[in-house]
């Protein structure tokens, strides 16, 4: 198990480059098996989830080559293979293989997905979408078995109860080779969905309306990759570095961003008093002065992203007065980081799943646990702010979502080391 050791209290400065979007990458890799020709993805982040997805592809005889930020995937010799629950349970995004396998083979056998522990994240909308396309779905021995009818999947009108990113992406992948037209109503509008649609359209799919709440897909016979696909920048990684820069930065420029993907987040940070200059594809975050508390409410895109409520929390602690409020309307139970911040001296608490933050003059180093990716990012920022040494256990969770994090932090001047905990078997050593 990984530990991140931070000797904090040092102002950081310099430049940082944002990697490709994790939430695109973890869908694009499974979607690659829909192609009958080799796929090239560029701008791929070096994160643990990518390595885990490559392992799952290996189970299906799909060859992968990952060099620097380019991932080559060759599915030409793919075989239909059940994906075991053991490997699936470490990776929530493995559920995208349901839609991808169903679209490619007309059948998917996938163990129940795992990933971050942030409360209930049911996949009932995914299942209802597959059933609307004509598939049968059953649960057996901790596996989901999805089977298309003998004459294949048929297009359908599917109305999502809520705009789920995962369900929208899975239905797109299953329906691109279905017969006829599929319409997804109340679809999620996240930039990562546009990225997936662009990738599939460049392989011959016919998808219109991605980025709106109604997506139309005309089924085609097969897909063939023709050109490399460059993944969009990671808006969550970018937002995390904005928070870090405002908390402990002495002037940091963040490169490779799409500002409009961060509109809701940047508006809230600037409401606090953080000064940011935006160029065409970069942001410069000035050293923060006196900041004021704000209220944060997460929402589906284009609202404030749930994945950024934890990274902004340390910034609230730097305000000079008042009470900051964080309400996560997407995952109300995403509060595990609060007890860990309290170990570091943070004046923060939870009441009825609402986070209440108060000015905290100084954090101190402590041993804390990164229960999931974004909680880990929150604690990482807090550790960089704190006096003394902070040890973050389960730091492998941070590596699941943040590209080359140790290297990037050191380039900004941070004293950070990631190592294996000698008391726990090491995993993900190749990240």
Curated annotation (Swiss-Prot):
Entry superkingdom: Bacteria
Annotated catalysed reactions: phosphoenolpyruvate + UDP-N-acetyl-alpha-D-glucosamine = UDP-N-acetyl-3-O-(1-carboxyvinyl)-alpha-D-glucosamine + phosphate
GO cellular component labels: cytoplasm
Locations listed in the record: Cytoplasm
Keywords: Cell cycle, Cell division, Cell shape, Cell wall biogenesis/degradation, Cytoplasm, Peptidoglycan synthesis, Transferase
Biological processes annotated in GO: cell division; cell wall organization; peptidoglycan biosynthetic process; regulation of cell shape; UDP-N-acetylgalactosamine biosynthetic process
Chain positions recorded as phosphoenolpyruvate binding sites: 22-23
A Pfam cross-reference name: EPSP_synthase
Signal peptide start and end residues: none
This enzyme's EC code(s): 2.5.1.7
Single Gene Ontology MF annotation: UDP-N-acetylglucosamine 1-carboxyvinyltransferase activity
Physiological role: Cell wall formation. Adds enolpyruvyl to UDP-N-acetylglucosamine.
Name used for this protein in its record: UDP-N-acetylglucosamine 1-carboxyvinyltransferase
Organism: Lactobacillus acidophilus (strain ATCC 700396 / NCK56 / N2 / NCFM)
Gene it is expressed from: murA
């Amino acid at each position: 198990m990984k530990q991140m050791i931070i000797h904090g209290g040092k102002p950081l400065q310099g430049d940082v480059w944002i990697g490709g979007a994790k939430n695109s990458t973890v869908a694009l890799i499974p979607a690659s098996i829909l192609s009958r020709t080799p796929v090239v993805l560029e701008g791929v982040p070096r994160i643990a989830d990518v390595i885990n997805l490559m392992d799952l592809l290996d189970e299906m005889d799909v060859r992968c080559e990952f060099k620097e930020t380019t991932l080559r995937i060759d599915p030409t010799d793919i075989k239909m293979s059940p994906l075991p629950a053991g490997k699936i349970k470490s990776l929530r995004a493995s559920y995208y293989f349901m839609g991808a396998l169903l679209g490619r083979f007309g059948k998917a056998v996938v163990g129940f997905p795992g990933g971050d522990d942030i409360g209930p994240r049911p996949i009932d909308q995914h299942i209802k979408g597959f059933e609307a396309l004509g598939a049968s779905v059953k649960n057996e021995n901790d596996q989901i078995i999805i089977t298309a009818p003998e004459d294949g999947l048929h297009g359908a009108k599917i109305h999502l109860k809520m705009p789920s990113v995962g369900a929208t992406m899975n239905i797109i992948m299953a329906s691109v080779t279905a017969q006829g037209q599929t319409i997804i109503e109340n679809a999620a509008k996240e930039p990562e969905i546009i990225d997936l649609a662009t990738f599939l359209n460049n392989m011959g799919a016919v998808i219109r309306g991605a980025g709106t709440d109604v997506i139309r897909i005309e089924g085609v016979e097969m897909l063939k990759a023709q050109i490399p696909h460059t993944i969009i920048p990671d808006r969550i990684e970018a937002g995390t570095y904005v928070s870090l820069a405002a908390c402990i930065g002495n002037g940091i420029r963040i490169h490779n961003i799409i500002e409009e993907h961060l509109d809701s987040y940047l508006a809230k940070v600037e409401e606090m008093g953080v000064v940011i200059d935006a160029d065409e594809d970069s942001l410069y975050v000035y050293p923060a002065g006196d900041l004021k508390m704000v209220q944060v409410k997460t929402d589906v895109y284009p609202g404030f992203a749930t994945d950024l409520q934890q990274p902004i929390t340390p910034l609230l602690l730097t305000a000079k007065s008042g009470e900051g409020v964080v309400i996560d309307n997407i995952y109300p139970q995403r509060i595990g980081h609060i007890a860990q911040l309290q170990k570091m001296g943070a004046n923060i608490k939870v009441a009825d799943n609402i986070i209440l933050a108060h000015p905290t003059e100084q954090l101190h180093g402590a041993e804390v646990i990164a229960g999931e990716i974004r909680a880990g990012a929150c604690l990482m920022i807090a550790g960089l702010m704190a006096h003394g040494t902070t040890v973050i256990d389960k730091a492998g969770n941070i590596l699941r979502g943040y590209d080359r994090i140790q290297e990037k932090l050191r380039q900004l001047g941070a004293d950070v080391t990631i190592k294996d905990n000698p008391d726990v078997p090491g995993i993900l050593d190749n990240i």
